[in-house]
């Protein structure tokens, strides 16, 4: 077996389904040499049963659905699958990701050229087509962490001294040695992982990828950034502005410092805990301000932002739009008839909040290329799966009963 892919799921079954579909649309790789483990952490949306129905073992013998009786966390769930994996390479993959048809081919081909590879990551793209800065990160040492918390990395993003957290001084289009690989897409070899060890289960939800990446570096390996694109919705499993996220993330960083920078423990403990409190207060203020804004300026009577569907299954999409009360315009097209995608529109793409591409008529690679070549912050990627009858956007999921 060449590759074992591990996906940890918690209440995002439709994203897992879409992710699995993108895996099986991969080109340039032998799908019979790929096994997939989906570890369900006691989801409340009936994920395990749903996925087993959509991907029956008779048709997908290499997809294994593992179920836990409680939410054991990200690291422990991954470790459960690692023990069952048979692949030469192991890929840790978030459920809210979408692979292009060439993502796996590109990353596996690149491993042949990488020297002493520990872990490798890819160029992650947000749903508006912009580059996700967490695709490349430096080790969050006390200095690097201070620069981030103090905002110095934002003031001097290209500086190797102040801007190392996101390493924006590196090209996004070149293979580069980096420090930290995002757990959203993290490829390693089974051999290297055996030497370094699995995920530290002390971490529950955040920080595991930072810890594992750092352990590879300390063991003498090199970590790499590979500029092949991947869509990462990010935020569907968690809400980044919530108190819970802020608290759990910074607590994870405190665990990281205690583990790897023991001699700084006393000095770092207070500022990190202070950061937790300050960021939590900021998150609460932002949340309450947004709620107040919605209360004072209700959307009643205001025309909702429109969506655009591009594909050949408009009749089915119209049924979904009617059921959910969506405002959708329709353009019958495919890659051949519309080679520039939504950039061919006579009106500005910013007229729409979502541009929904039918993945039966357009490849994922085509869709990401169109959004990446000219991102609009207010215009988001949407996908429609005609076979399943599901529209997936960054904020909502709509499906035909």
What is each residue range found by the language model?
Residues 21-33, 324, 373-374:
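Short, acidic, metal-binding catalytic loop of nucleotide-sugar glycosyltransferases
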Residues 139-178:
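Short, flexible, basic/aromatic active-site loop/helix in glycosyltransferases
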Residues 90:
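Short aromatic/hydrophobic "clamp" motif used to bind/position activated sugar donors
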Residues 98-134:
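Conserved donor NDP-sugar-binding/catalytic core segment of glycosyltransferases
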Residues 22, 40-49, 70:
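A conserved acidic beta->alpha catalytic loop
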């Amino acid at each position: 077996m060449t590759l074992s892919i591990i996906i940890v799921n918690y209440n995002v079954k439709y994203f897992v389904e879409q992710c699995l579909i993108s895996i099986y649309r991969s080109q340039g790789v032998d799908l019979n040499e790929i096994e997939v483990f989906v570890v369900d952490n006691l989801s409340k949306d009936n994920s395990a049963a749903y996925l087993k129905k959509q991907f029956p073992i008779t048709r997908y013998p290499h997809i294994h659905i593992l179920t836990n009786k409680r939410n054991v966390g990200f690291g422990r769930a991954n470790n459960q699958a690692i023990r069952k994996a048979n692949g030469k390479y192991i890929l840790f993959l978030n459920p809210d990701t979408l692979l292009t048809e060439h993502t796996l081919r590109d990353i596996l081909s690149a491993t042949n050229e990488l020297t002493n590879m520990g872990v490798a990551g890819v160029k992650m793209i947000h749903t508006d087509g912009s580059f996700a800065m967490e695709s490349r990160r430096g080790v969050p040492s006390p200095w690097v962490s201070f620069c981030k918390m103090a905002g110095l990395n934002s003031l001097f993003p290209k500086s190797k001294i102040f801007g190392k957290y996101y390493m924006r001084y590196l090209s996004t289009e070149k293979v580069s040695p980096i420090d930290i690989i995002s757990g959203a897409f993290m490829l390693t070899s089974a051999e290297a992982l055996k030497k370094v060890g699995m995920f530290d289960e002390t971490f529950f939800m955040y920080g595991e990828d930072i810890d594992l990446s750092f352990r590879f570096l300390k063991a003498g390996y090199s970590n790499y950034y590979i500029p092949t694109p991947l869509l990462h919705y990010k935020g569907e499993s968690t809400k980044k502005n919530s108190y819970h996220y802020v608290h759990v993330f910074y607590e994870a960083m405190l665990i990281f410092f205690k583990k790897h920078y023991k001699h700084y423990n006393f000095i770092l403990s207070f500022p990190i805990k202070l950061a937790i409190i300050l960021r939590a207060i900021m998150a609460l203020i932002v949340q309450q301000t947004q709620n107040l804004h919605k209360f004072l300026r209700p959307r009643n009577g205001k025309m909702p932002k429109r969506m655009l569907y591009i594909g050949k299954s408009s009749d089915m999409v119209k049924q979904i739009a009617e059921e959910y009360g969506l405002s959708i315009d329709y353009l019958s097209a495919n890659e051949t008839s519309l080679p520039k995608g939504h950039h061919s529109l006579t009106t500005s793409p910013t007229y729409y909040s979502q541009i929904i591409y039918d993945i039966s008529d357009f490849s994922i690679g085509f869709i990401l290329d169109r959004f990446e070549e000219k991102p609009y912050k207010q215009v988001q990627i949407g996908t429609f799966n005609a076979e399943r009858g599901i529209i997936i956007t960054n904020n909502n999921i709509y499906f035909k009963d």
